[in-house]
Amino acid sequence: MRNDYLNLYYNCDSIAKIEYKKRDEKIDCEIDKYYLDGNHYNSKDKEKRYKIEQKEICKQFEVIKKHSNNKATPEKKAQSKLVLLNNENEDSNWFCIDVEYVKSFNNRVEKKEADFNGRFDIIALSKMKPHKVALIELKYGSGAIGGTSGICKHIEDFSKFCEKGYFEGQLKQEIIE
């Protein structure tokens, strides 16, 4: 949960945004239409997101699951399996608390000025005190090492994340809250 909403994930893919509207005393759900109809939409297309009743998400679960499975890459499937198996393992020293973490900004101007667009595959917290935080990037196959989301890019992102104080200033606080 972050910024008064939570993301519903399947295959480490954000399926829906779920938000409690205190003023209206109701839950709003918004889903990427791909998971309902299997059609890909332009990211700027206003038709891409769809308001949906929470009961409808449950009714459509098999359809959503099917489309997510079609979209999931081997890396995403491995990431999802790693998180699930780790968190089910009582003997693990770590507990995965978040997937696909993106630093939030107050607005687009702040985001542009920050010049930071990094994303971490998994955030894990050690079970033993003193607690430690692990920012995990998973790569699947040699083809995932180079390119725009390769190892070098993630090292740069991690360095920027630490240099700009995002770990101490925001992530730590989000974990505590």
Short names for language-model regions:
Residues 1-177:
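Charged, terminal alpha-helix-loop-beta segments
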